[in-house]
Amino acid sequence: MSTIDHLPPLRSVIRDHDLSARKSMGQNFLLDLNLTAKIARQAGDLSACDVLEIGPGPGGLTRGLLAQGARRVLAIEKDARCLPALAEIAAVYPGRLEVMNGDALEIDPLSALTPPIRVAANLPYNVGTELLVRWLTPQIWPPYWQSLTLMFQREVAERIVARPGSKAYGRLAILAQWRADARIVMQLPPDAFTPPPKVSSSVVQITALPAPRYPADPYVLSKVVAMAFNQRRKMLRAALKGLGPDIEDRLLAAGIEPTERAERVSLEGFCALARAVAAT
């Protein structure tokens, strides 16, 4: 039994409930409760927060969040095989764990959550980026969440915190850093999971700012950035020609040379360009 919550070790839970990870669901289960507890601590003081968790699987991180003192955890799990294991956790923490069986891409969790809200998850790799983009692109800011403590494949994590001029710099970096602080807070080796993935994983902490760093319309900025990085090796005057025949004038108005490439334009530069495009 675990000294954290007197529940069985994760290996036993996975064995007893026959929870072999399914590649089709993007599953890689964390095995070490010390690691899940460490991830939960990265989310900060949870005693006054509801926590949204996506893809809890056998419940390793769920247990860490509850042991860390989370006021309440709402866990969305698509794989019905995991529900009995999660029910065992709920029995140890009465009234503090609610489990929804469904697809996180199709469920609106807000009605089941009470602010303040934080998100913590070992995201299934096949939906992680899409969920992150949704969390980062609401029209209204600040968002419903205070912070996101999320595990990704290391390559994705590096894209979130990347700086201009690096190969990893792109849309994710701009969306994450425009209205939030983003940093990598943990690295995890493949053998921390079952089955072991081919690459290392990283935990990223994203904390919402009260307001954007620079003014810009979210829709326009997202559109401009997507177009620019879809053809990142092209000069911006070519990559953005779909925005209109006067795109060179708009680039110059934003202080950007039309011959520049997307990977060398700063966040401030893209926001200036979004304002110039919106002014047309």
Swiss-Prot record:
Main subcellular localisation: cytoplasm
| The enzyme's E.C. designation | 2.1.1.182
Task: Tell me the GO molecular function terms.
Answer: 16S rRNA (adenine(1518)-N(6)/adenine(1519)-N(6))-dimethyltransferase activity; RNA binding
Q: Which is one Gene Ontology cellular component term of this protein?
A: cytosol
Q: Which UniProt keywords apply?
A: Cytoplasm, Methyltransferase, RNA-binding, rRNA processing, S-adenosyl-L-methionine, Transferase
Q: Which InterPro entries match?
A: KsgA/Erm, rRNA_Ade_diMease-like_C, rRNA_Ade_Mease_Trfase_CS, rRNA_Ade_methylase_Trfase_N, rRNA_adenine_dimethylase, SAM-dependent_MTases_sf
Q: Where in the cell is it found?
A: Cytoplasm
Q: Kindly give the Pfam families that the UniProt entry links to this protein.
A: RrnaAD
> What's this protein's family per the entry?
Belongs to the class I-like SAM-binding methyltransferase superfamily. rRNA adenine N(6)-methyltransferase family. RsmA subfamily.
What functional role does this protein have?
Answer: Specifically dimethylates two adjacent adenosines (A1518 and A1519) in the loop of a conserved hairpin near the 3'-end of 16S rRNA in the 30S particle. May play a critical role in biogenesis of 30S subunits.
Its name, as the record gives it, is Ribosomal RNA small subunit methyltransferase A
Q: From which organism does this entry originate?
A: Roseobacter denitrificans (strain ATCC 33942 / OCh 114) (Erythrobacter sp. (strain OCh 114))
